[in-house]
Amino acid sequence: MNPNSNSITKSHLFHIVNPSPWPILTSFALLLLVIGGISSMHGYKFNMYILSAGVISVIYCLYSWWRDVVQEGIVEHQHTSPVRKGLKIGMVLFILTETVFFSVFFASFLKSSISPVGILDGVWVVKQGIWPPPTIKTFDPFDIPFINTLILLLSGTTITGAHYALEEKNQKDCVTALAFTIVLGIFFTLMQVYEYYHAEFKFTDGIYASNFYLATGFHGAHVVIGTIFLIVCYFRAKRGDFTTEGNGHLGFEFAAWYWHFVDVVWLFLFTFVYILGS
């Protein structure tokens, strides 16, 4: 980061990013996180240490990277109109890739439900199975899953209220609505953990269980990431970083987009995995 870069007159409106260690360090941190996750699934030695190191490394790298991006926008004023447009396109493309990512889980779950695999004379045979498998005791969709649906729908309302308050230059209401959204996100995560703790099937108990935990688990991870995103926005809003002039609240806008995306994915999960899957 060059603190004097703002004093240099540029002949264009684009931001030439300074050399940064965070992309490559984040890549290694994610690799460590994946290794830790796989080790935990197989019960390898030191798996929790590796997983914890991966989580801490990813959080630190992302914090440092986003801190630099915020500084480039607020301190160095590098986020000109073309730069903001590029950031918006990047966020839209990111959400589209996430849509494809979750579509794979839905496709796998639906394919397995249409053509369930069962064991016949010791051989895995298509269409000989029952869906859900008789060994799986599914969750009541109108118990904890329904409560979580209401929580996320309410959080979508509060984040929209925060955005509206920001547009109206009402900092107090914006901060309050963000706080409510964060609390709802944390409560959703705690309810999900409670559901997992009382589940009567494990990740390794067949195709239904693995599909269920992968789909809901990755969604839960996205809720945690979104909650962290909102916590950052909460402190930035309290500090007065966000303005309505020149679209000076991209960070908040992206957090709201991401949170609404998480809401929509959950509605599909609730419909296909919990209701139709039960």
Curated annotation (Swiss-Prot):
Pfam families: COX3
Swiss-Prot/TrEMBL GO biological process terms: aerobic electron transport chain
Source taxon at top rank: Bacteria
Ribosomal protein among keywords: no
Enzyme class: translocase
Catalytic activity: 4 Fe(II)-[cytochrome c] + O2 + 8 H(+)(in) = 4 Fe(III)-[cytochrome c] + 2 H2O + 4 H(+)(out)
Cysteines joined through disulfide linkages: none
Gene Ontology annotations for the cellular component aspect, listed alphabetically: plasma membrane
TM spans (from-to): 21-41, 46-66, 89-109, 174-194, 212-232, 256-276
Membrane topology of the entry: Multi-pass membrane protein
Family stated for the protein in its record: Belongs to the cytochrome c oxidase subunit 3 family.
PANTHER family the UniProt entry points to: CYTOCHROME C OXIDASE SUBUNIT 3, CYTOCHROME C OXIDASE SUBUNIT III
Protein name: Probable cytochrome c oxidase subunit 3
